[in-house]
Amino acid sequence: FVSKIEVQAKAALTDLQAGANQAQVIFEIVNKELVELLGSQARRVRLAKVAPTVIMLAGLQGAGKTTLAGKLAKYFADLGDTPILVASDLQRPNAVTQLQVVGQNAGIPVFAPEPGNGVGNPVEVARAGIAFAKAKLHNIVIVDTAGRLGVDAELMQEAKNIRDAISPDEILFVVDAMTGQDAVRTAQAF
């Protein structure tokens, strides 16, 4: 991705007319490549034919998964759905508490049977959260998973185990724009 942009930018800047805006040329090249990489069409979240729709959030620590979980749940609630948040990030200190605060602020219930801070089994929490959602007739389940400061074998295995256990209808990869060039490598790893 980056090397492709670099080649195009060098070629465009070589052919640049006097007085043209170099920054604008580079911006247009990056924009074109991002649209090609990510797709030009907006796509709605894939909803399950039979409720609940299960959405798993994945990504590195600090990327905004927990915040997105709350915003996504609020979006669905505003549409008339009955979302629930599932606290499967049991590694990061106070991650469960953070999701509970986000849920409370958004008016969304949170399934959090474990205190987190390294205690509990995230796969079992995800599985139990879906069972709870079915029993309480929630039609959208958003599973907030753990991140790490970087991609590692433990993180990838945990994400895979949760995915295999809950068979989500959607897996949303959350990345912070500040991740920069590493975002592509991280997305490929996930």
PLM regions and their residue ranges:
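Conserved catalytic-core segment of NTP-binding enzymes
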Residues: 121-135, 148-190
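Primarily NTPase-proximal linker/entry elements flanking Walker-type ATP/GTP-binding cores
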Residues: 1-145
